Amino acid sequence: MLKLLSRVLIGAFVFGAVLLDSAPLSTAPALAARSSDAAGVRVVVTPKNLGPGVTVWEFEVVMDTHSNPLNENLIQVAALVDEAGRRYTPVAWQGDPPGGHHRKGVLQFLAPAGMPKSIELRMNGVGGADTRTFRWELK
C-alpha cells in the first residue's frame, strides 16, 4: 500500500511539474525601462503590468537626486496619454512618500477599455523639470 501511495504521489508531482513548465509566464511582452535626466533628477520608469485582460496598469518609478528633495505627489503630476490624446489619471501610488532624495514605488492606472497602439507617461514638474515624457509602442 505504501509503495502504491508513493508511486501516485511521484506521478502527480511529475505531471504537475510538466504542466507548470509548459504554462506561459506572461501574455504581454516585457517593455523596456525609459529614463529622463533633467534638473539634477534622474527618473526611471518601467512598465510592469500592461496588456489585454489586465484591469490595472502598473509602472515602477525610481527617482534619484543629490540636490533638492523629491516632494511631488505623483498622483497629481502624472498622466497616461494614448495615441488618440485620451488622458488617464493615476488611481494609486504605492511607494515612498514625498520627500528625500531617493524614491521608489508603483504608479497605478485603470487600464484603457481597448488596447492603445502607444502610450506616454507624462510627469509635470518632477524635480523642477517642465514635463518628462516616457513613451512605449504597444502594437
Locate predicted features.
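Extracytoplasmic
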Residues: A38-G40, V54-E58, I75, H102-K104, ...
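Short, solvent-exposed, Trp/other aromatic-anchored flexible loops in extracytoplasmic proteins
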Residues: A84-R135
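Short, surface-exposed binding/anchoring microloops in extracellular/periplasmic proteins
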Residues: V44-E72
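Bacterial N-terminal signal peptides that target proteins for export
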Residues: M1-G16
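Low-complexity, acidic Ser/Thr/Pro/Gly-rich terminal tails and inter-domain linkers that flank the onset
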Residues: A30-G53, R86
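Short, surface-exposed alpha-helix to beta-strand junction/turn motifs within ectodomains of secreted
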Residues: N71-A84
